Each structure stands twice: as C-alpha cells, then as structure tokens.
Design a protein with these regions (language model features):
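Active-site-proximal loop/helix segment associated with metal-binding centers of metalloenzymes
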Residues: 4-75, 82-91
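Histidine-centered catalytic micro-motifs
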Residues: 75-82, 114-124
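Low-complexity, flexible helical/coil segments
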Residues: 1, 27-29, 37-43, 110-116, ...
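Histidine (H) residue identity feature
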Residues: 15, 43, 79, 108, ...
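Short hydrophobic-aromatic micro-motifs
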Residues: 2-5, 134-136
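Binuclear metal-dependent phosphoesterase catalytic core
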Residues: 88-90, 94-114, 121-164
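Active-site metal-binding loops of divalent metal-dependent hydrolases
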Residues: 7-9, 80, 119-122, 139-141
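Structural motif
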Residues: 1-2, 73-75, 115, 144
Length: 164
C-alpha cells in the first residue's frame, strides 16, 4: 500500500452552475461576493497563475504515481477534493472553483485507490464513488462545529471498511 501525499491545487475547472469558463465563474463569484481569499493572498510564484501551478503539480504527481513500484494500491491524500462530487454540498456553489481540478476525477480508479482523504470543504463525511471510500477529514472552524458539540474527530483509514 502506498500512501501518496499529493499537494495538488485547483484550476477553476469546478465551474459554478451556469458557467463554462474560469472567467465566467470568477465573474459570478465576484458579483455574488463569494470570493476565496486565495485570490488576494495565495501568490502562484514561480508560476504566472494558480491554474498553471495546478497543471504543473498534477503532471508531476501523475508521473510519480504512474511510476509507483509494482502498481501498488494507494491511499490518495490531498488538501482539495479529487472529484467534483463533494462540492455539490457547498452552501455557496460559486466557491467550488477553488476546490480542486477535473484533471484528477478518475485518479481513484486509475491509481487503484483504497481510500481518498481530503479536506478543504469543512464538511466532514464519508462518501463512496465507484466503490472507493472518500473521507473529508477537515476540522473546520469553531463557528462551524460548535453547533454540533465539537469537531468530528479522527477517522480510521486503514483497515478499510467495505461499502454498504
């Protein structure tokens, strides 16, 4: 089993509903006032843009996963979701564009993932896609978890439970 920390980013490809381009998605976000602080605080240096940075990270990580010894099964770990599905639960759909990339949508199948672990959304939960378990493990901010009585707590990743 290979535990693979991925360090990927986002490329604005999780477009808000009704949009098809990065520019249109950003326009909707700015019009609604739902804009990720990354637009001001996260500088893409040495890349020109955050999406170029994401493309480079995806390419390098894909290459390394393809070279893993004996095609070992994986546990993929990333800050951002690996597929679009988890963003369907966001209160503000405009925010999805800062939550990952469509370039990794099939990686859980392509790289024989036994589990995919991610955060960023602050919506802790377990989901299943194509028979693969996806764990959103972020703690979130106190204002988000205090109404529930506390953060969700730790999750067991291995040994893996089976889909029900």
């Amino acid at each position: 089993m290979l535990i693979a920390p991925l360090f990927l980013l986002y490329d604005y490809s999780f477009h808000p509903p009704g949009t098809r381009t990065k520019e249109a998605g950003l326009a909707v976000a700015y019009e609604s006032g739902i804009v990720c602080a990354d637009e001001v605080l996260l500088h893409p240096d040495p890349y020109l843009t955050r999406d170029e940075w994401c493309v480079a990270r995806v390419a390098e990580t894909k290459r390394r996963l393809e070279e893993r010894p004996g095609a070992l099964p994986t546990i993929l770990v990333n800050h951002f979701p690996m597929t679009r599905e988890p963003t369907t639960k966001l209160r503000y759909p405009e925010f999805a564009q800062w939550c990952g990339t469509t370039r990794t949508a099939d990686w859980h199948r392509r790289f024989d993932a036994r589990a995919v672990v991610y955060g960023h959304l602050h919506i802790p939960r377990t989901t299943w896609e194509d028979g693969v378990r996806f764990e959103e493990v972020s703690l979130g901010y106190p204002r988000e978890w205090q109404p529930r009585g506390g953060p969700a707590g730790l999750r067991r990743i291995k040994p893996e439970p089976r889909a029900s």
